[in-house]
């Protein structure tokens, strides 16, 4: 299947990743471990829509926790991925507790997960996470188009019950 520009996603995303890694990550941001960064990018996509355990991600990639934090920062500053903080009434906990990870481009996340078609998505164990990523990013894009910046959070209790997105607006909440 092709996009409206006639470029198949299976052709577009590898080229996009190569350009991003070569130009932005290596040349502009100074990352030298390109092969490791590519593995990191794929393993980060495996965690889309999940509470992010940076230590686990680092261990799976064979890199230090500090390197993983640095590379997550690079994904954020280059608008590849972002973290959604947890909601707590205690503001300090919002900053210190674990965030969820999302990719701005759900198609890129799906590609990194090896999902190249609707049929593969339907059969994928990651379909729920990919769908959650899509919903969260589309809501964010909608607010940005309206030039609004509400505070967005996720919530999970000790029994692992969760709310994927909380939108805080002037003291009220939309779930």
Task: Write out the residue ranges for each language-model feature.
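Accessory nucleic acid-recognition modules appended to NTPase machines
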Residues: 4-173
């Amino acid at each position: 299947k092709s996009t409206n520009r006639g470029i198949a996603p299976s052709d577009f995303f590898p080229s996009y990743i190569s350009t991003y890694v070569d130009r932005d990550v290596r040349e502009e941001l100074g990352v030298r471990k390109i092969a490791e960064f590519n593995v990191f990018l794929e393993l980060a996509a495996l965690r889309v829509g999940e509470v992010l355990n940076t230590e686990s991600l680092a261990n799976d990639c064979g890199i230090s926790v500090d390197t993983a934090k640095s590379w997550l920062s690079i994904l954020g500053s280059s608008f590849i991925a972002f973290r959604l903080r947890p909601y707590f009434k205690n503001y300090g906990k919002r900053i210190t507790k674990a965030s969820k990870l999302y990719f701005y481009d759900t198609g890129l996340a799906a590609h990194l997960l090896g999902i190249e078609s609707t049929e593969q998505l339907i059969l994928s164990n990651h379909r729920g996470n990919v769908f959650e990523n899509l919903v969260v990013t589309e809501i964010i894009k909608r607010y940005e188009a309206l030039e609004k910046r509400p505070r967005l959070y996720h919530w999970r209790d000790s029994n692992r019950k969760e709310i994927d997105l909380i939108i805080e607006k002037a003291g009220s909440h939309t779930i």
